[in-house]
Amino acid sequence: MANLSKIKRDQMIAFLESLKESHSDDASIQAFNEIENHIRDKKYGLVWEEHSEEVDDLLKENIPILTADPERRLCKDASLPWNFIIEGDNLQALYLLGKTHKGKVDCIYIDPPYNTGARDWKYNNDYVDGSDVYRHSKWLSMMKNRLLLAKNLLNPADSVLICTIDEKEYLRLGCLLEEVFPDARIQMVSVAIHSSGVARSEFSRTDEYYFFVFVGASAPVAVPLGLEWQSDGTKRQQDVRWESMLRSGNNGRRIDRPNLFFPALFEESTGEFLGFDKPVPLEVSGADYIPPLGAIAILPYASDGSEACWRISAKKALELKSIGAFDWSPIKDGKTTLKYLKPGELEKIEKGEYQVVGHKENGAMIVSAENYSPKWVPGTQWHVPTHQAGGAGGSSLIKTVLKTKRFDFPKSLYAVRDTLRFMTANKPNAIIVDFFAGSGTTFHAVNLLNAEDGGNRKCIMVTNNEVSVNEAKELKEKGYKPCDDEWEKYGIAKFVTWPRTVCCIEGHDVDGDSLKGTYTTSLGTEIKCSDGFKANVKFFKCGWTPRKPEDYLLSNALCLHIKEMIELQNAIEVDNVKNVLILNKEDFRRTILNADVRPQIERVWVNQNIIFSTEELKALKEIGYKYIPREFFGQELREAAE
């Protein structure tokens, strides 16, 4: 079958080649080459009109930098790692995270704009609404640029990107994820978030979708789950499973495993177990086997009366009997059921998940699973009451903490907690990034998860400081404009994300009153909201510095922001006591040569451009030090010829 599109492309390219022969000047050749490149562009899969952003233009002439906000810092426990909220365009932040966290992130969770047509997100400082004919192209351009940078952060051996979306863009998002992550395994989960449905002219929307992009060996972890995960209200099997010794199904015939067709012998009068006899020769029928005098022989027969085989050997069965892991039912009409505990069940006993509460007369263990919570991975449809966006973990929680409705459509705390739990239950020190942070649910969920299992997961959230449409209108009517202090005060980073984070860690609302109620843990227990969480968090703001300054050295400008990069990369606070940054000789004298500070120093970072004497280097080596990583701004300095 002819590829008509390819034939047409080849014809156009051949025509361009002929034009090149008659128009050989540089301008014409350059124009022809651009036309040819466009003709050869991808013509299949997800194709859209790519749009540029103002931030792209800013990146060409400027370098993103971070500056700590000294008024927004919360230390609850100095022994714990630090978390970070970064205010700024997420393209800026991802550029910097690519320098501090390349290949180090375990989980990225994002809840991007759903592009519903409402005025809920901006492209180049303008709201994108339903009347914009390029709204899908703008959304895809915005997402692709960020996903490409985010991909660079993920641990290639084992990590996951989770992206939530609804029906407006899920088809395009799925194609985009396949394009950006061609080697990943991608799965979509449906999550019920509105049991009553969102009213519309079509079917009411009750759910949204979570894309899981599994990188490397990443996979969801089987974890204990409560009954709310059972849509039909029934329990998952929690009883101790004694496996029947009779094999069924594939390879279950005697002819398949002739060595496993052997008799189990019992005392005829008492039913006492006597042991096993040798396998019956294949040419001898089981019916012709004659047991020892006074014994009953139990041979493996299928339910249809045909000769079958056992699952395990006589030797293995006796080994299990010696530890109480082999059992049988009372003999009735010359029949009994042999059973044993498989390795998985024995492991649960060893771990204390099952309890041995006694032994039967035949020596078999009596095992209780009363306190055991089975571990499993759910299916792709989640109907969990706590995942409701308008419930106690969603908008109601936001209003309780912030006292007013400062944010529309927050995710349920428990939906995010459960999502992160499936991917990081086996990673208590995971690094989690959310670069569409919004109301700050992700960090809240990380704190709750850490409180549940004692983990030290770290979270980096990125959000801009946009005000809502209504707030912008009110502020403009009062004469305020973007960048005014009064305007910035009501931006989402400062008005929602930060205060929610502080309140939830400290256990009070924005008025200072203790939070009422409890958090429900994954296993159904409760944690008082007023107890808060043990966590530390810093607030950074993205800024710019020119790539080629005229009146000063770029290296001097960048040195002012190295501290934040080191803190972000290492989840620490550079306090110049415990963690020390040496940018010049004065820093060296104030710390390394300070008899009061030196004994407290644990880690040191040094500017490579400082020339130290032999004695000074010796003092540094005694403590141990690292040079400021070249990957921070080495490329930018080379471009500036520094």
Task: Give the ranges of each region predicted by the language model.
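Active-site-adjacent helix-turn-beta-strand microarchitecture at beta-sheet edges
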Residues: 216-399
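DnaQ-like (DEDDh/DEDDy) 3′-5′ exonuclease domain used for proofreading
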Residues: 1-109, 117-139, 145, 157, ...
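Conserved proline-anchored active-site loop of SAM-dependent methyltransferases
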Residues: 103-122, 177, 432-447
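Conserved S-adenosyl-L-methionine
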Residues: 131-136, 140, 170, 409-505
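Carboxylate/His-rich catalytic cores and anion/metal-binding grooves
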Residues: 41-57, 87-116, 120-121, 334-384
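Coupling/switch/interface segments within P-loop NTPase motor domains and analogous charged loops
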Residues: 1-55, 310-319, 324-355, 593-595, ...
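Conserved Class I SAM-dependent methyltransferase catalytic core
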Residues: 136-189, 493-517
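Signature of N6-adenine DNA methyltransferases within the class I
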Residues: 143, 157-159, 166-233
